[in-house]
Amino acid sequence: MKYTKTQLALISMPIASGALTIFLVPHMLSFVINDLKTNQIYWYVRSEPLLTLMLVAAVSLFYTLSQKLHLRKAITFVSTAFFCITALYYIGSEIKRLNPYVGQQGITWGYALKFMDPMVVFGVILGFVLLAIQVIITSPRTSNVKRAKKGIFGDAAWMNLKEAARIFPSNGQIVIGERYRVDQDNVRNIPFAPGNKTTWGKGGTAPLLTFNLDFGSTHMIFFAGSGGYKTTSTVVPTCLTYTGPIVCLDPSTEIAPMVKFARKKMGNRNVIILDPNSLLTKNFNVLDWLLDENIPRTRREANIVSFSKLLLSEKKSENSSAEYFSTQAHNLLTALLAHVIFSDKYEDSERNLKTLRAILSQSETAVVNQLRMIQETTPSPFIREMVGIFTEMADQTFSGVYTTASKDTQWLSLSNYADLVCGNDFASSDIANGKTDVFLNLPASILNSYPAIGRVIIGAFLNAMVTADGNYKKRVLFVLDEVDLLGYMNILEEARDRGRKYGTSLMLFYQSSGQLVNHFGEAGARSWFESCSFVSYAAIKDLQTAKDISERCGQMTIEVTGTSKSRGLSLTKGSQNINYQQRALILPHEIIQEMRQDEQIILMQGHPPLRCGRAIYFRRKEMLAATEKNRFAPQAKKS
């Protein structure tokens, strides 16, 4: 572990305080014996070794207790070394005093050592007692569970940190944690407090664990409860280190202001911020990738079908009627969107979602009349067939379909959000050039009401990478914080399964596994776990998630000692037996109750589970110096 100059000075302080104690004890004794009688002076002088050794140990003990927890272990080591040197000096002086008598008149060392100064002997003993107390206080408590040497019922174990350094070297670009065991640190039994550095332990100074997108699908899922430092421990550090393009969903709207200048310094990058509440926001046309005439028309038609799904709320319903209206609303949106894109009626600047909304904002009768006109005039068989469903539909049925489609595109009536997805400041394909970053400052309150806003923007960028067909400079990292707000997105599953070859890597953040199951179902959630390079868990409060982690970490074999005692008049002392039992590597209640918020468990295929720290940016000086002030948290001083 690397220490700063200040920390090294604090760690070496026992040497200075011990030397000062050795210097002051004789002066203190000479001051005390000034007015004493001769017979009293003798014992005070004799007590000098005892006082010196005891005070050296006592001063180091009290000094250690006054220091931060993560420094105490190193201070104890220095204190022990200094005390041993001091003790050896006094013992050596006694041996030197007794040495001339050894060999005379048959005197041996065994006999001569009986005449060692008792003050030295007791001083050494009492000093080591104080040092033992210091060691006990500074050493973290170890687990009472005794692992068996034989893995009869399982041999699950945590990944060795050397192996972790090989898999996740410190010189990578995507920061996932810090290479140290929080549960073995001095502060393991103290809750993590961001404003109290004494609770940080080795956090902020340990080497980083980083991912180079060099194994598996390159996708990642992070689970952390509310207030679990998802943004500060992973999103911000990664934005400071990843040199490729980033598309970042930020419902808290705090990330871009913190990292935009750091991103711009990385090779003169173009940092685009999509913020509907800012006058300086950029905008683009989310349909621009569908307007590329170099792509075959049949493929563009298929893309329109998939994109239309992003506009609809994908809430699962057991009501067959609601399911029917949702399906037909999707068909209606597909037909109208295809008309907007392919019809000669519109200029290129009008081929956007505003035009789609303008059609749907008409009365039902006007929409039906326009659909009939489209059916009669369009040369496209695809559009004609899609529209034909609705021209002969019963009025009441069409009313339900129209209401569903109108409701799910209602957000396009909000001018600032409509402008965001219907502009021309840049193209979605720009992210393939390797020099463009996009931050989506979409407030959580808006995404809760209109998740389609986030879906169409992210979907446009994902589809732009597919359209690029492997023609990209660097892999695009999609950092989707609070991705649960977007609801179900089929395109995310497509990116998960085929995104690696198209240059997309997903970094998804959920509060619990239940959110993943809610949108993708049990089978879908299993597919996500199987397809990701790794899954990280931290700050878990949900019992079911804790049970899932416990099961995935595996079982180990432990030794259990049983003791039986005899009662009554029996003279036997009882018996003791040892048996082997199965135990989870970590139990659900240990995950919820004992794991600190700056600790995480990382699971990946083919390797043992990794238990390590989290790279919270404000604990690391180099990261803190690179970021701007976070308006949601007090800023520590940069040094």
UniProtKB/Swiss-Prot annotation:
Positions of transmembrane segments: 13-33, 49-69, 75-95, 118-138
Record-linked InterPro entries: P-loop_NTPase, T4SS-coupling_protein, Ti-typ_conjug_TS_TraG-like, TraG/VirD4
Recorded name of the encoding gene: virD4
Which CDD domains does the UniProt record give? Answer: TrwB_TraG_TraD_VirD4
**Protein name per Swiss-Prot or TrEMBL:** Type IV secretion system-coupling protein VirD4
Record function comment: The type IV secretion system VirB/VirD4 is a major virulence determinant for subversion of human endothelial cell (HEC) function. VirB-dependent changes of HEC include massive cytoskeletal rearrangements, a pro-inflammatory activation by nuclear factor NF-kappa-B, inhibition of early and late events of apoptosis, leading to an increased cell survival, and, at high infection doses, a cytostatic or cytotoxic effect, which interferes with a potent VirB-independent mitogenic activity. These changes of HEC require the T4S coupling protein VirD4 and at least one of the effector proteins BepA-G.
Could you give one GO CC term from the UniProt record? Answer: plasma membrane
Q: Which family does it belong to?
A: Belongs to the VirD4/TraG family.
Keywords from UniProt, A to Z, are: Cell membrane, Membrane, Transmembrane, Transmembrane helix, Transport, Virulence
Keyword check for Chloroplast? no
UniProt membrane topology term: Multi-pass membrane protein
Q: What is its main location?
A: membrane
Organism for this UniProt entry:
Bartonella henselae (strain ATCC 49882 / DSM 28221 / CCUG 30454 / Houston 1) (Rochalimaea henselae)
> Where is this gene product found?
Cell membrane
